[in-house]
């Protein structure tokens, strides 16, 4: 049974969602603000559902604090039409963003998709335990990436993007392939979430000696590892 942390200041909605999630077989704990969520945060949670608009500490600030100490998958619950919240959430390392009001079945489907990915970091991407390149090492059994033995603190999406690029050995990996393999959905014209995850990955990777970057963008084609 997967344990979830649901964070929302709307007590009535929290109770309704808790009931829904428990009927789907999840073990749900709740928090009504960001400070309470941070106090409860521990390694036993498989996913955090995090509302944006909350008193004391809003969802964006709470996400920042979570990412300082944990790579637990986070789904942001945003107000419909508030694109800035969605963009900020993805930039700060959220795994997904779902606008309110949402369809119950879509919420459950997205939660299960995130849990599938996080449960198997090497799912459909690699059948080896370790993959190394120029100081970077991917540890598939733990789903972590290190550089010179220092944890890069990548999210699940960032880890899988880096894995595909390292395995490509300099060949182009299309945006369509990244979307299907990493996010398990086809690429759509106006969805910029993949670009946000790639941008976050670039920021987390250290500077390379004698080379401008770890991977390059090929306009209209995709991305390729700089070997």
Swiss-Prot record:
Role noted for this protein: Member of a two-component regulatory system.
SMART domains noted in UniProt: REC, Trans_reg_C
Domain Response regulatory: 3-115
Ranges of the DNA-binding region feature: 128-227
Protein encoded by which gene: cpxR
Superkingdom of this protein's organism: Bacteria
Gene Ontology molecular functions: phosphorelay response regulator activity; transcription cis-regulatory region binding
Keyword check for Transcription regulation: yes
Modification(s) after translation: Phosphorylated.
Entry-linked InterPro entries: CheY-like_superfamily, OmpR/PhoB-type_DNA-bd, Sig_transdc_resp-reg_C-effctor, Sig_transdc_resp-reg_receiver, WalR-like, WH-like_DNA-bd_sf
Name of the protein this chain belongs to: Transcriptional regulatory protein CpxR homolog
């Amino acid at each position: 049974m997967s344990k979830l942390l649901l964070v929302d200041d709307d007590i009535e909605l929290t109770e309704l969602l808790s009931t829904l999630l428990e009927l789907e077989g999840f073990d749900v704990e709740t928090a009504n603000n960001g400070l309470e969520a941070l106090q409860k945060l521990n390694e036993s949670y498989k996913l955090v559902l995090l509302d944006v608009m909350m008193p004391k500490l809003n969802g964006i600030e709470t996400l920042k604090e979570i990412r300082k100490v944990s790579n637990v998958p986070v789904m942001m619950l945003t107000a419909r039409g508030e694109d800035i919240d969605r963009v900020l959430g993805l930039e700060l390392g959220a795994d997904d963003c779902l606008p309110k009001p949402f369809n119950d079945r879509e919420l459950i489907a997205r939660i299960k998709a995130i849990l599938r990915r996080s449960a198997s970091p090497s799912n459909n991407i690699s059948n080896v335990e370790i993959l190394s390149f120029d100081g970077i090492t991917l540890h598939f059994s733990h789903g972590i990436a290190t550089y010179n033995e220092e944890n890069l603190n990548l999210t699940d999406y960032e880890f899988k993007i880096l894995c595909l690029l390292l395995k490509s050995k300099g060949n182009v990996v299309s945006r369509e392939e990244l979307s299907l393999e990493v996010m398990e959905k086809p690429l759509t014209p106006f969805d910029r979430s993949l670009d946000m995850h790639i941008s976050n990955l670039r920021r987390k990777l250290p500077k390379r000696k004698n080379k401008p970057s770890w991977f390059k963008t090929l306009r209209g084609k995709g991305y390729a590892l700089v070997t």
